[in-house]
């Protein structure tokens, strides 16, 4: 530990055994406050360093909860392998080299483990997070998909496959596919919709079904939203059969609530029959966003339909390619107009007048 004066302030540094370099704790107006901070850092390092990975992991979801319970359950699942192998070790004993080796073998677990060590770092239980800055590329999921990755023809094939493999329930599956691809709602939101949520040409997304906790919750951003209900989406619902007294728009083959696990069993034969075993229902949301951008809507407009609250930033980063194609088409149209002599003719008429 080191306390020293720099200008009019007092600085505190501690030695980091992993980086073998001093780490800055903070700057304080008086030496007394700096010494107190030094003692506090020493105490936290002494007590925090003794906590094992297993002990911290056990209390992590409780002491550092995320807003959604499903996220806490997901994180708990993702750290399980790491805890089983390193649970008896002290938090501060995990080196960056070990973290990198683990992350290379288990890239899908990296985000959750990094978040756990981040929380330990914020409370000064460890000096550094060994899982930060590893330079390991993680999957971008649905990002960077080409504009023609999912087309209208693909959607139609999925609908046809649904009718083929599911018999009397086929029209419901087909309607669900069409509805999701036109509205862009998330799967959990789709399974929570009620007929009363369709109001004219609008759809009110009030709730979402959480398949991990088997509960009904608010939509992802914590509040209801009103979006556009295209005519074809309404027609898809009106054309499908219903159970007597059915309240949810989309239900299972026997009228029960749809959850992720049950839907996967229904979805797998459909996508296989359509020749697209790589698809998930969430990809209908991607199709919706891509289609709206190709129709010339702005990223902020598409964000409203999808339920994003970032004014289109995520739409641009995830689905930016269609808008670029549309932009090039508009530029080409403008250039063609110029090269065809329209602009020159206008100038000549203006000069003559």
For each predicted feature, which ranges?
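C-terminal secondary-structure termini that scaffold catalytic or DNA-interacting sites
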Residues: 1-3, 160, 212-213, 219-226, ...
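Basic/aromatic-enriched alpha-helical hairpins
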Residues: 18, 40-46, 54-112, 116-119, ...
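Basic, Lys/Arg- and aromatic-enriched nucleic-acid-binding interface segment
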Residues: 106-111, 126, 132-191, 285
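Active-site/catalytic core of tyrosine-dependent DNA strand-transfer enzymes
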Residues: 152-155, 208-209, 230-276, 300
